[in-house]
Amino acid sequence: MSCKEDRSTPFWDTSLSENERLDWLLENMTLDEKLHSVSSGGYDLERLGIPGHNLGGEAAHGVEARNDQNGFGKPDISTSFPQPIGMSASWDTELIEEAGRVTGTEARVIAGRHNGQGLSRWAPTVDLERDPRWGRNEEDYGEDPFLTGEMASAYVKGMQGDDPNYICCAATLKHFYGNNTEDGRGWKNSSIDPRNRNELYLEPFRRVITKGGASGVMTAYNRINGVPGILNPEVQTILKDQYGLLHAVGDGGAMALVANVHHYFGMNAETVSAALKAGVDGMSDRPDQVYSAAREAYELGLLKEEDLDRSIRNTYRLKIRLGLYDRKSRSPYDRLTEKDLCSDHNRMISVKTAEESIVLLRNDDHLLPFSANEISDAADDEGKLAIVGPLSDVWYQDWYGGIPSYRKTLRQGLEEVTGKSIPCAEGYDRVIFRADGQPVAVDDDGSLIVGKEPDEFYRMDWGSGNYTFRSVRTGKFLTSGLYDASEHPERLGKISAAADSPFDWFVMEIFHLEKNGGGTSGSGSSHKENEGGTFTISDRFRRPLAVRPDHTIYAQQKDGRASVFTMEVTADGTKEAVNLARTHKKVILALGSCPMIGAKEEIDRKTIMLPSSQQKLIDQVTEVNENVLIVFITNYPYSFMEGGKTASGLPGDLLQEGVRRAKAILWSASGSQDMGTALARTIFGLSAPAGRTNETWYKRDDQLPDINDYDIIKGRRTYRYFDGEVIWPFGFGLTYTDFTYRNLSLAMAGPSLVEASFEVTNTGSAVSDEVAELYAVMPRTRVPRPLRQLVGFRRLHDVRPGETVQVRFRIPTAELSYYDTISGSMMTEEGDYLFFAGRSSADRQTQKVLHIPGAVPGKRDTACRIRADHYDDYENIELTEGRFGMTAVSLRDENKKGEIVFRDCVLGDEATHGKLLLKSKRGCRIQFLVGDKEVLAFRGDTASYVASASFRENSLNEGDRAPERWPAVWDEIEFSLPDVKEEDRKNATITIRMEGDVKLLSFRLFRPDPDAHRF
């Protein structure tokens, strides 16, 4: 930023109101300056002496200030907390607010180093985790909108601070909305009906804006019901007009995607215009591209200056509240200093957050906690404790994490807590390669070459065919050259041992091995098979590796010859781990994931199964040692099931045998600088675990619908609707003591407020935290309701043995509402509601029923227009863009029939006809059913056109004008109703069956007026 400030103008005058300062700004900006200011990049108004200050930056779990993308150069260190999925597992809103406060404080300090840049951060992510295969699972807060809303609100409150006039660091929620698929996220459509939208997908945003006070929202790349996220009018109509949101931005590059990927518009000018009118204030594409698009939009008449003014007013209002334009600083956050960065206090919050995020999933025979006398020197052949597994002694960087001042691996944490050296075996095989018969080695400059004595590599199997290889001799990872190709074309595709860790936007340390003759090499293959087989090896982009004449190895850029590789296992890593486990009394088996491999931004998981190499470790380690603690360091749930027989002797699912043998299991997310310390303190009882799962750990892949299916209700997703068996349910977590729940009491405290209280007693022998959870079960009603729904939770701290804590909640009855597709509004239905309290969503220790007053569902008046997307049920349907403020119903697969169902319909006594408002280009067939009475309502399209007279008295002669083919139009198609019994007219079920190319907006029933076409 090189703009020279001029603080003499009224814009810098803090004695004026925000609106007065903004009025002056808009009155004095030129049109060209306004067009430049549509970019979120922060355009300097040099003529007015007003620096732009960009809006952007990340803060998912602390400030991301690596500075590897923004041109600032050297990283700024910051405190790194657990990934959001981990922070949320603490179920501690007060602590997460403190973590947010540390994040906001450090963002403010770091911004002071960079002329105020980075005070509006794109965090937190509040997209619902409806599917554990989502690649960005780590960034979110769980599968429940209430938990997400409470936890993310706390983080936002901490980030933004509590000053009534100034914001410490502005929080921008991601990604509005229906963003839960990475593969194809730039063009796919999220089909979301009104119930899913209002009850689930909008809820985290509503809660974190209205309760947490989030300043901004970032739109999603994907389409929502046919409309690209950056063009979604709900940004204005819902987020701003209803929730009170201040500011909205598009995701990085989202403007260009509309034309280049969605092909929704042909020009960026159209996108800028539509986005601004939809309520998006800033485009996060290249500033020069945004300016060109805005300039063209204005010249074409697509944009008016008032559209620009509205956007600029929102953007600069936020910047004023950040204190960026005070003539004399009045913001309390400007008093923060370098001492507030990575301070002792911040580290204390980091350790506490990491500890509270740990979830104890199993503790048979009270294996945990370990005691200090169970540690011996590593030189002791009959040692007491060892650690094995691929996550034993490693700390992986994630994309949205910052650079902390230190990082603690699990092994380092154990050694820090115990003061002893802990023997370790990662369990990786060591292998050597031959390419076209020649040994593969690492040259002095790191290049991978052939012809020298072969080098050994650690083979790391991450599942789904993803491998990394680390040189045993140099410690560097193999990587495939991608960048600097323009200046150094010789680097493109070059394979070298040059990376310290798998990390970058494109993780070029990933390789794939394909057996010649078909198949992928898996870690379950025997050594003999590996030694005897030949392979094609390819890089992250599936470019096959080949030896060049100069003996170097490259990834081929085009269809070139692939070298034939052989791989020989020189050391069996599993055997080494097993031998270590066999000679120690207790073993910690550290398993999990690397946040840059297999699941990340742009990459979804293909399976929830634990990689076979890790399953193999579990099998063999637990076979030789009966005291195994498994520590999962991962940001998403795994499954580890096998076929077998249930207790009744019938075929069923069983936990894999090795997992069953493990006596204790802990789960921790990655990302915290104190991850290893927190785990070690928990293992040795210096901290008592009380975290809870925030998403379901399913048993099998086939329990999950298509990842592209966004219907949580019909798809039976999440704990709210899934009725099958799971490994661990939502809200589950054990402690080192026992707790009982009793005496649930319920009462109405007014017409729309429930008061609930119950007792929680520590019946064990250890002091511990406990997360008290309260759920509601909805009465049977005309539509599917949640099987259970979280309505209250509280983390109780340091509950002593024998102590009883009274837990109270005040629950607005609106928490029990659902979207009524008949009235088109949220409704709390009158009825008997069951409430239960316990330690998870599956634990009903104390329960009670309360009658809650409310509304009674009505009937559908078919004389009024019925929106097609307000159905009660459907098959093979996708929602897409409509018109007239309505969403269109189309077929997901045009080669199959589809239908929508409307129950509780009332037909007028005289209704004899119906009208369908639809559009069809290639032709469709629609059947209309009232009960079991059926009529063919329409067959054809709305593109064919035959001219007709305006009035039947003035008809054209037949043949005066031939039929023509035009673009399809929205048309109301009239049809006759089937004969319906009188009693069926009072409570009918209407089904509309569709075939072909159709977009249906609505229907209504009526009796035609015979005189309607007369003067």
Language model: regions and residue ranges:
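Short loop/turn segments at connectors of secondary-structure elements within structured domains
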Residues: 115, 167, 689, 766-770, ...
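Terminal connector regions
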Residues: 813-855
